[in-house]
Regions:
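Compact alpha-helical subdomains of small soluble proteins
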Residues: 87-166
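Bacterial Sec-dependent signal peptides at the C-terminal "C-region" and cleavage site
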Residues: 16-33
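Short N-terminal segments immediately surrounding and downstream of signal-peptide cleavage
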Residues: 28-48
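N-terminal Sec-pathway targeting helices
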Residues: 2-13
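Short N-proximal segments of mature Sec-exported proteins
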Residues: 46-106
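Generic short amphipathic/hydrophobic targeting helices enriched at N-termini
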Residues: 11-17, 115
Length: 166
């Protein structure tokens, strides 16, 4: 009887593990989808982040993903500008919302030839790769590059928003 009970427990644990892991994989795949539904708020977040980074003098090119000190110093990284815009538009920060994901996708597209370098640099610092921070901190990233990924993300969200209205 106890052997049967152990097998049943083992099978139950195995099934639950598959369900949980499968759910996380599906969730991650949905987050990384490039055709998520967009809203006017997504567009406003991108526009606000772009406005916050009005010129190179307010850009912090050494992001650590801690934004309070950036705000106090009057400079923002790409990540911190998006975080501030997110909070202003949504009332809270949502790490994986569509607006931020679109910027991540624009970064992936702009840095296809440097993806390996970004991952290696992150691993050397014993951290997981963070596309927004890693792109911001690449030595060859210029302020114009930051503005360009915001522009690309804004155009993509705007185009999808217009298509959804038709």
């Amino acid at each position: 009887m106890t052997t049967m009970r152990r097998r049943l427990t083992l099978v139950t644990v195995a099934v639950l593990t598959v369900v949980v892991v499968g759910g996380r994989v599906r969730q991650q795949m949905a987050i990384e989808s490039r055709d998520q539904a967009v809203t006017a708020k997504d567009l406003r977040i991108l526009q606000k982040a772009d406005a916050l980074l009005k010129n190179a003098s307010v850009w912090n090119r050494h992001d650590d993903r801690v934004c309070d000190d950036d705000e106090a110093g009057g400079k923002r990284s790409l990540f911190c500008a998006l975080q501030k815009a997110d909070r202003e538009i949504l009332g809270e920060y949502e790490h994986r919302n569509v607006a931020l994901q679109e910027v991540r996708f624009a970064i992936q597209d702009a840095t296809r030839d440097r993806q390996t370098e970004m991952v290696i640099r992150a691993l050397r610092q014993f951290s997981l790769p963070h596309r927004l921070m890693d792109f911001n901190n690449l030595p060859e990233t210029r302020f114009e590059d930051v503005k360009q990924v915001l522009r690309v993300a804004t155009e993509r969200v705007g185009a999808r928003l217009n298509r959804s209205k038709q």
